[in-house]
């Protein structure tokens, strides 16, 4: 892709804070408990508190991750989040926007937009460390449901980020 776009100097640069344009919306979400709960859970995961997965996820949670990955349960969540964090062990994770919804006849829902910014310093989902400065813009949506015990747990999760943009940042670093 980089070569097809004219090489490292001419190619389309991936989105980073350096080329960001401030839009008209600057809100950070709402005060709903479900958005706060999802944001808190993601912050804990990114602080390597992976035990939160077994506490917050339903054992049969359906999980959709980048690359067309469809997986289930604690193991699937562990594998995805640990792989991402392992690639960028010292990167700074920030919640940028969190919203939750409680509506009649609907399950509780939440959406979080987040960023991960730092160097590719670890072995994980993005292979051998390169030292590349990487910026990941991600979004996680979740649906919660009650168990027999009545304690609501995360039962569906959809997390997205642009894998191609992450790889492009890594490859551009290698070509410099």
Place the predicted regions along the sequence by residue.
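Alpha-helical membrane-targeting segments
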Residues: 30, 175-176
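Short beta-strand edge/turn micro-motifs at domain boundaries
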Residues: 1-12, 107, 111, 133-175
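Alpha-helical packing segments of well-folded alpha/beta enzyme cores
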Residues: 37, 41, 80, 138-140
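A solvent-exposed, acidic/Ser-Thr-rich amphipathic alpha-helical stretch
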Residues: 44, 49-120
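Residue-level preference for long, well-ordered alpha-helices that form the structural scaffold
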Residues: 30, 34, 73, 131-132
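Short, low-complexity N-terminal intrinsically disordered segments enriched in polar/charged residues
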Residues: 2-55, 59
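Short, solvent-exposed secondary-structure boundary motifs
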Residues: 86, 130-134
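Short, surface-exposed loop/helix-turn segments at secondary-structure junctions
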Residues: 122-131
């Amino acid at each position: 892709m980089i070569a097809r776009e004219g090489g490292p100097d001419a190619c389309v640069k991936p989105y980073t804070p350096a080329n960001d344009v401030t839009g008209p919306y600057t809100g950070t979400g709402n005060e709903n408990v479900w958005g706060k709960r999802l944001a808190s859970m993601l912050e804990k995961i990114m602080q390597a508190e992976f035990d939160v997965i077994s506490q917050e996820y339903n054992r049969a949670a359906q999980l959709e991750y980048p690359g067309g990955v469809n997986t289930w349960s604690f193991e699937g969540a562990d594998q995805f989040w640990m792989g991402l964090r392992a690639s960028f062990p010292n990167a700074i994770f920030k919640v940028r926007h969190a919203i939750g919804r409680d509506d009649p006849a609907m399950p509780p829902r939440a959406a979080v937009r987040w960023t991960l910014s730092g160097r590719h310093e670890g072995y994980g989902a993005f292979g051998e460390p390169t030292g590349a400065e990487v910026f990941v813009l991600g979004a996680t949506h979740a649906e919660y449901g009650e168990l027999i015990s009545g304690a609501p747990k995360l039962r569906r999760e959809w997390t997205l980020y642009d894998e191609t943009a992450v790889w492009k940042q890594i490859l551009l670093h290698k070509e410099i």
